[in-house]
């Protein structure tokens, strides 16, 4: 539909994610695991499958996949989410290699927690009696001391979508408020 309307696809921001229920692996439900993997990993795969084909044919384009800092490390209690976001990081690298000979760039962004409804749900899962305490606990893991603002993410996506990043592909960008420095 996009190609029919606009003639080509210049940029694809492959951004979707759910956390699922917070629980140790031994308490995780396989159905819940599959649900998280379907949205977070299969969704990215399907986006790549269809958009990468178009971009390879047109010999240009930029794809930005959203993973998470959890896709570069481990985070107790959200194993399905962590596994799904590690998979996104791997898919990004493969797509970058496959797209590079055709002028298609593929990168991943790895945000720390972002001020969104998804984080409110996760905080409630970690501490149903005091979600604000859960938020403060997560913020203590971030040296800057706060969640990312959606605009923080948008700024990096705009850079990766632009010609200013024409020699960048297969990269993993952390937007983590200093978490990697610890």
Label each residue range with its predicted role.
Residues 111-125:
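Short, flexible catalytic-loop segment of classical short-chain dehydrogenase/reductase
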Residues 19-22, 73, 158, 169-182:
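Short C-terminal tail/terminal secondary-structure segment
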């Amino acid at each position: 539909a996009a190609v029919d309307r606009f003639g080509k696809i210049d940029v694809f921001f492959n951004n979707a994610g759910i956390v699922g229920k917070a629980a140790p692996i031994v308490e995780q439900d396989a159905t819940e695991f599959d649900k998280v993997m379907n949205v977070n990993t299969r969704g990215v795969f399907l986006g790549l499958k269809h958009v990468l084909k178009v971009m390879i044919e047109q010999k240009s384009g930029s794809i930005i996949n959203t993973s998470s800092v959890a896709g570069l490390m481990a985070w107790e209690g959200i194993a399905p989410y962590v596994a799904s976001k590690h998979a996104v990081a791997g898919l990004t690298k493969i797509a970058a290699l496959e797209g590079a000979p055709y002028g298609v760039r593929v990168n991943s962004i790895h945000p720390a927690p972002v001020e969104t409804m998804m984080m409110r749900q996760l905080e409630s899962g970690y501490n149903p009696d005091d979600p604000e305490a859960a938020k403060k606990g997560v913020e203590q893991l971030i040296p800057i001391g706060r969640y990312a603002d959606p605009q923080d993410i948008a700024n990096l996506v705009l850079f990766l979508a632009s010609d200013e990043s024409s020699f960048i592909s297969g990269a993993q960008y952390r937007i983590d408020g200093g978490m990697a420095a610890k």
